[in-house]
Amino acid sequence: QERLSEPGRTVMAEVIQILTQQGATIVDPADIPSVTDSDAENNLLANGNESSVLSYGMKRDFNAWLETLGESVPVKTLTELREWNLAHELAGTLKYGQARLDGADELDLEEDRGKYEVDRERDLRLNGEHGIDEVMMNLKLDALLFPGSSGAGISARPGYPTVIVPFAFVATDPDPPMPAGFDLKPRPFGVSFTGMACSEPRLLQL
């Protein structure tokens, strides 16, 4: 909870209290082994936790999908899509930018395949086997509880399920602050229940 805001900590304390009242057994701490491992090879946060898997897969699979659409499609590759967006910027194609597309398109699907495979193995091992699997099996847990969507990254990389339950609204304290007169509304705050592979039925049951 060190990175949570004070309102976030208050909400999480309330969540834990309600779960306890409903009969849940809260195990705290339940540290992710790959986060606390002193060996850099086995530490999820080493090297900034960077992985090429999402970007590589995006380019590979997007190009493969475009090939299935036939000749009527106006763009045939991710590169062509990026170029089309740039050419039509005045029409609003880049309202939110395309940094994710740019990063993916920088990869070469042949030359970078080796790095992708290494990163994929590391993602599965540190997020899954030495991460979620290990802590849940060692402590005999039904689920891991995360504030908001903070557990989405560690569960997404090995393809594990997460159920996010809306719970409250909390005050927003942006840094830097918003301009004077800006009416900043409270933001929604949910809690995430994450499990091991194929544990969706148990998560929904909880």
List the predicted regions and their residue ranges.
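Glycine-rich, small-residue loops and helix-cap segments
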Residues: 13, 18, 95, 99-206
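N-terminal leader/propeptide and maturation segments of large enzyme subunits in energy/redox metabolism
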Residues: 52, 58, 64-125
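Gly/Ser-rich, acidic/histidine-flanked active-site/gating loops
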Residues: 1-72
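Acidic/polar loop patches that form or flank catalytic/metal-binding clefts of enzymes
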Residues: 22-31, 73-79, 143-146, 163
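Short, solvent-exposed polar/charged micro-motifs at secondary-structure junctions
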Residues: 36-45, 90-92, 173-176
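Residue-level preference for alpha-helix termini and adjacent loops
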Residues: 3, 52-53, 57, 64, ...
